[in-house]
Design a protein with these regions (language model features):
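Short, acidic loop-to-helix structural element flanking the phosphoryl-transfer center
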Residues: 2, 80-109, 115-123, 146
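Short, glycine/polar-rich helix-capping loops at beta-to-alpha or helix-loop-helix junctions
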Residues: 188-198, 221-225
């Protein structure tokens, strides 16, 4: 079945924004005498909105609501001025979005980043390649709650059966599962392929071009293909257990060719 609607996560999926996020949260916490934050610390703290990123970057003994609010305000002020300093689209993303648009796929973006920043980044880097962008908005729960993604899907005019939700984190995979959408994990982002698979990814993409075949042909039903595996091997590939074979097959569902 051909897919007609794409909903992408932003940070770690379309944009490598790690450097600017790290610089901004470090500025915010250092201003109040707390230790700087490393790129790796920032990477593992991203995914649940900037308030959570700031909260997790403040030492536990100082982590009061008042201090979180103060540091969050400093983060937003700095990030608003510097969010395009080091941020850039992942290699191949713009080309993939251009191809999706040419093929009639409607594209939306759903982020836990606050709404004004998400919209500014999409406009700057992708322009009209993205139809609608939702960031974090007042009184609407963040991902993985399905409220926002279902609102976005409705506004895009899509339906669940022909929509792929694409992201780089467990939060994204859980969002898709909660909304009843097909979940595609991207292995170039801030989380590992293992985490994505364990969190409910229906298929993995290792590079943006892998997404194109998923939109053209849909995602294979691995449970059905599993029945065809004989001797825990297929083609010239052999595995110690059936689970290992099926795990590898899941990875190939993003356009990787395997002879069977």
């Amino acid at each position: 079945m051909k897919m007609t609607t794409a909903i992408f996560d932003l940070d770690g999926t379309l944009l490598n924004s790690l450097g600017d996020l790290c610089d901004s949260v470090t500025y915010a916490v250092e201003k109040h005498g707390f230790p700087p934050v490393s790129m790796e610390q920032t990477r593992i703290r991203i995914g649940n909105g900037v308030r959570k990123l700031v909260e997790r970057s403040i030492p536990e003994e100082s982590r009061t609501d008042e201090m979180i609010d103060i540091c969050l305000a400093d983060f937003r002020a700095f990030y608003g001025e510097h969010m395009m300093n080091r941020t850039h689209p992942y290699e191949g993303i713009v080309s993939a979005l251009e191809t999706l648009k040419e093929n009639g796929v409607t594209v939306g973006v759903l982020s836990n980043k606050y709404d004004s920043a998400a919209k500014a980044l999409i406009e700057h880097y992708f322009g009209d390649l993205v139809c609608i962008t939702y960031g974090e908005r007042p009184n609407i729960p963040r991902k993985p709650d399905p409220t926002s993604v279902l609102q976005l899907l409705d506004e895009l005019g899509g339906d669940k059966e022909t929509t792929l939700y694409i992201g780089d984190s467990a939060t994204d995979m859980q969002t898709a599962v909660n909304a009843g959408l097909t979940a595609i994990g991207v292995a170039w982002g801030f989380r590992s392929a293992e985490e994505l698979r364990a969190s409910g990814a229906d298929a993995l993409a290792y590079e943006p071009s892998d997404l194109l075949s998923l939109f053209e042909y849909g995602v294979p039903d691995v449970s059905k293909v599993e029945k065809a595996l004989t001797g825990y091997g297929f083609g010239s590939h052999y595995f110690a257990t059936k689970d290992e074979a099926v795990s590898n097959l899941r990875d190939t569902c993003a356009g990787k060719s395997v002879s069977m």
